[in-house]
């Protein structure tokens, strides 16, 4: 037994996920690591970011749309504010492309 945790920071976890993705196994890894509630919370966070980046709804409207508390929306908004405009554009582009890719798969 070692005296410390094998994974001690976020970058190590990101490397683990990247390695799994290279093998095409990121989905089972994340499914194993996260409880259903954690996965649901992550889906909510992705939707929060998507709605905030679109900028069409108020935080209260997003809260009602997604069924999450206003404080949850505020935390997402505060996190977004800590990123550059370039990062926000990249994320919005990724979110839009991912949605379109999913729709294309459903049509097939």
Swiss-Prot record:
One of the GO BP terms on file: negative regulation of DNA-templated transcription
DNA-binding region of this protein: 59-82
UniProt KW Flavoprotein keyword: no
GO cellular component annotations of the record: cytoplasm
Signal peptide limits: none
Keywords, alphabetical: Cytoplasm, DNA-binding, Repressor, Transcription, Transcription regulation
GO molecular function: DNA-binding transcription factor activity; sequence-specific DNA binding
Subcellular location: Cytoplasm
Record bears the keyword Membrane: no
Entries under PANTHER family matching the protein: TRP OPERON REPRESSOR
Family: Belongs to the TrpR family.
UniProt function note: This protein is an aporepressor. When complexed with L-tryptophan it binds the operator region of the trp operon and prevents the initiation of transcription.
Assembly: Homodimer.
Protein name: Trp operon repressor homolog
Organism classification: Bacteria, Pseudomonadati, Pseudomonadota, Gammaproteobacteria, Vibrionales
Gene: trpR
């Amino acid at each position: 037994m070692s005296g410390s945790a094998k994974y001690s920071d976020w970058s190590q976890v990101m490397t683990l996920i990247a390695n799994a993705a290279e093998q095409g196994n990121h989905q089972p890894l994340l499914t194993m690591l996260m409880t259903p509630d954690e996965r649901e919370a992550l889906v909510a966070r992705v939707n929060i970011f998507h709605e905030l980046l679109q900028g069409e709804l108020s935080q209260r409207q997003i809260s009602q749309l997604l069924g999450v508390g206003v404080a949850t929306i505020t935390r997402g908004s505060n996190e977004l504010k800590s990123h550059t405009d370039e990062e926000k554009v990249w994320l919005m582009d990724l979110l839009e492309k991912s949605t379109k890719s999913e729709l294309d798969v459903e049509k097939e």
